[in-house]
């Protein structure tokens, strides 16, 4: 039976966590599966052919996801981002996009993808109400791209997907995780590609998400270093901060780019983001060790008001600030993997 949304459920006034941070953004993982095996997310030695992915019955249904989005919207969330795994592997994803796009209070609906399946789905996603798209792209070099993705899928396939998304009317952002000595020498090529096509490149510091990605501090390229590299060729002017990214415009007027500095310049103090896994666990930090099982609450027959209390109560007790404490008391602590949390 379809759950009835309670239009009158009352949200706590000015919901804040223990550090006075509001709840504004929700990232929703719709699948734990991916057709890439990027080493910082799903290394093949741990996610091989015999890896047991989640059974379909354990995933939240689209109806359950939409119901939770209504609850989060009542608590102040205005921005939704769909992630994975690779979200475009979830069948009929455009149906979910349409359901979320129709929810009052949601003003921004975006998707993060590796782009490999985008060509065939871009138009349907736009028609359903998707507003923006972000494509992960760590290299333009054909051989290095396939090495980093540990996949037979070519970079050309991803570029065709990006072009299809742009042609369908979606603003495109490109996410690049730089690693020293691995792909940092391709940064300027990515900048030139983004500028030429009117996309926004975001350079992300290599982060220690989960416990299986082999993270070492020596491979982190600090945002300041990456920015200096770009500015030496293409002068930059600061715009300000937007969410997790520091925004900079090109002085010649040809667009902008961003830098996400979770390691060198943590932004925990302004983080307003929650994460919902494909099985309905609520995480209040990308580096969290455990989540809150909302699927169990949903499937127990809870009312929307009860869901509101559970979610609101969890956020009100939130005190996460891992990136500010990195290296102090977090060594050896098992954390959820990026592919599970949705990045």
Residue spans for each PLM region:
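Auxiliary Fe-S-binding modules of radical SAM enzymes
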Residues: 2-25, 192-196, 206-343
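Glycine-centered loop/turn positions within well-structured domains
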Residues: 36, 142-143, 266, 292
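A short acidic, helix-capping loop that chelates divalent metal ions and anchors anionic groups
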Residues: 48-52, 119, 141-149, 210-214, ...
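Conserved alpha-helical substructure of the radical SAM core
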Residues: 2-84, 88-107
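Residues that scaffold the ATP/ADP-binding catalytic core of kinase and kinase-like folds
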Residues: 37, 41, 143, 148, ...
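Radical SAM/AdoMet-radical enzyme domain recognition
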Residues: 59-81, 89-202
């Amino acid at each position: 039976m379809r759950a009835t949304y309670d239009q009158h459920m009352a949200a706590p006034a000015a919901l804040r966590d223990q550090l006075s941070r509001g709840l504004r953004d929700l990232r929703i993982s719709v699948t734990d599966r991916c057709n890439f095996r990027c080493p910082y997310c799903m290394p093949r030695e741990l996610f091989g052919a015999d890896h047991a992915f989640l059974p379909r019955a354990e995933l939240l249904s689209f109806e359950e996801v939409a119901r939770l989005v209504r609850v989060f919207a009542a608590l102040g969330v205005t921005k939704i981002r769909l992630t994975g795994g690779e979200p475009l592997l979830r069948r009929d994803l455009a149906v979910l996009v349409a359901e979320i796009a129709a929810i009052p209070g949601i003003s921004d609906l975006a998707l993060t993808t590796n782009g490999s399946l985008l060509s065939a789905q871009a138009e349907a996603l736009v028609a359903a109400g998707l507003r923006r798209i972000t494509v992960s792209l760590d290299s333009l070099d054909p051989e290095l791209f396939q090495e980093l993705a540990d996949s037979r899928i070519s970079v050309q396939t991803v570029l065709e997907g990006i072009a299809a998304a742009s042609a369908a009317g979606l603003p495109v952002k490109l996410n690049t995780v730089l690693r020293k000595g691995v792909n940092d020498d391709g940064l300027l090529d990515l900048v030139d590609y983004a500028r030429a096509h009117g996309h926004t490149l975001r350079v992300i510091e290599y982060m220690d998400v989960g416990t299986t990605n082999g993270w070492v501090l020596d491979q982190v390229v600090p945002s300041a270093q990456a920015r200096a590299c770009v500015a030496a060729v293409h002068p930059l002017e600061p715009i300000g901060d937007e969410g997790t990214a520091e925004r900079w415009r090109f002085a010649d007027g040809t667009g902008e780019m961003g830098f996400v500095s979770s390691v060198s310049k943590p932004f925990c103090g302004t983080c307003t983001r929650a994460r919902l896994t494909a099985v309905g666990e609520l995480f209040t930090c990308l580096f969290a060790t455990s989540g809150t099982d909302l699927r169990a609450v949903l499937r127990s027959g809870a009312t929307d008001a009860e869901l509101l209390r559970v979610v609101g109560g969890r956020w009100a007790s939130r005190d996460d600030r891992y990136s500010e404490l990195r290296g102090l008391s977090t060594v050896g602590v098992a954390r959820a993997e990026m592919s599970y949390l949705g990045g």
